[in-house]
UniProtKB/Swiss-Prot annotation:
Keywords: Acyltransferase, Cytoplasm, Iron, Metal-binding, Transferase, tRNA processing. This is tRNA N6-adenosine threonylcarbamoyltransferase. Fe cation binds at H120, H124, D317. It catalyses: L-threonylcarbamoyladenylate + adenosine(37) in tRNA = N(6)-L-threonylcarbamoyladenosine(37) in tRNA + AMP + H(+). GO terms for molecular function: iron ion binding; N(6)-L-threonylcarbamoyladenine synthase activity. Its cofactor is Fe(2+). CDD domains: ASKHA_NBD_TsaD_bac. InterPro entries: ATPase_NBD (IPR043129), Gcp-like_dom (IPR000905), KAE1/TsaD (IPR017861), Peptidase_M22_CS (IPR017860), TsaD (IPR022450). Belongs to the KAE1 / TsaD family. Binds 1 Fe(2+) ion per subunit. Its EC number is 2.3.1.234.
């Protein structure tokens, strides 16, 4: 079964073709990703310091068809070779979701194909299954992105239990806001992580929110405020030496990243102990953070559990994860999982409410 995946939830337009089984008879004998195209809107939104929803929607309209053509060309397929269409139904920006939904539904209807709406987070948490060492069910998923920070127990395809989540800012959002305080470009996640590598540990005693709360929830707004207070104190000194300013920013970035990593690692380890799971999946945009990966690997070696990651190129939003998750959903429901004819989207959508019965 060849599934077309379309991702337009925020500021990346992603299109991909995934083949569930190796077949012959004129169709690809290769199982896996057949072709993909991805366009990021980062450059367009940088001047605004964040995503502008209207601009995002318009750009998705411009990009989605050329990316489909690109994916078909890569895979040497025609539209008539596609067996199903999967698209991001939510959560995300309403206008952006509507572009992908309308495109996918119209294409599916024109080709008389089934279509399936995919939960964006399900795409992320299943993407490590595409890695070299796939996790075994059940596993714990740490979903960390600009909009979400959650711990999930994953018992199988379509069977998810929320164990904990952020009570305010997501970790990725805290990265972006802190980067802005330090004068770094949008998006700040990668920039602040790179800056932190130049910093010294232990210079600032930043809080590690809810580290000892006893539950699996998160909170990062207080950490962001603590960084702001340190910036204000430094500015009051009116230091004009550029090297001192640069070192201050690097040291503060290091302390900030260390604080977030400590909380994420501690809560993940606690979730594994509470559930008895031996496999941890790290997914979402922050999943590309090398400091977090290193800390999890070190903890896994010491405490006898395994950590699984998606390929680095699949940490950001992409069409591959939507095609893959849609294919797994359809196989789990014997190809019977289709959406209604309306261009229905779910900007706010609880993953557990989408569990298979």
């Amino acid at each position: 079964m060849i599934v077309l995946g379309i991702e337009t939830s925020c500021d990346e337009t992603g299109v991909a073709l995934y083949n569930t089984t190796p077949w012959g008879e004129g169709k690809p004998a290769f199982q896996g990703i057949l072709g993909q195209g991805l366009h990021s809107q980062i450059a367009m939104h940088r001047d605004y310091g964040g995503v502008v929803p209207e601009l995002a929607s318009r750009d998705h309209i411009r990009r989605v068809l050329p990316l489909l053509d690109q994916s078909l060309a890569q895979s040497s397929l025609k539209l008539t070779d596609i067996d199903a269409v999967a698209f991001t139904q939510g959560p995300g920006l309403a206008g952006a979701l509507l572009v992908g939904s309308a495109f996918a539904k119209s294409l599916a209807q024109g080709l008389n194909l089934p279509s399936i709406g995919v939960h964006h987070l399900e795409g992320h948490l299943l993407s490590p299954l595409l890695g070299q060492t796939a996790p075994q069910f059940p596993f714990i998923a740490l979903l960390v992105s600009g909009g979400h920070t959650q711990l999930m127990k994953v018992s199988g395809i379509g069977h998810y239990e929320l164990l904990g989540e952020t009570l305010d800012d997501a970790a990725g959002e805290a990265f972006d806001k802190t980067a802005k305080l330090l004068g770094l470009d949008y998006p700040g996640g990668a920039a602040i992580s790179k800056l932190a590598e130049q910093g010294r540990s232990g210079i600032f005693d930043l809080p590690k929110p809810m580290l000892h709360s006893g539950d699996l929830d998160f909170s990062f707004s207080g950490l962001k405020t603590a960084v702001l207070n340190q910036v204000k104190k430094f500015e009051e000194k009116k230091i004009a030496i550029s090297s001192e300013i640069a070192q201050f920013h690097a040291d503060l970035a290091r302390s900030f990243v260390n604080a977030i990593v400590a909380v994420l690692v501690s809560k993940s380890e606690k979730a594994l102990k509470q559930t008895g799971c031996k496999h941890l999946v790290l997914a979402g945009g922050v999943g590309a953070n090398l400091q977090l990966r290193s800390a999890l690997n070190e903890k896994a070696t010491r405490n006898n559990f395994e950590v699984h990651y998606p390929p680095l190129e699949l940490c950001t939003d992409n069409g591959v994860m939507i095609a893959f998750a849609g294919a797994l959903r359809m196989l789990a429901k014997n190809n019977g999982s289709t959406t209604s004819g309306a261009f229905d989207i779910k900007p706010r959508w609880d993953l557990q409410s989408n569990n298979l019965v």
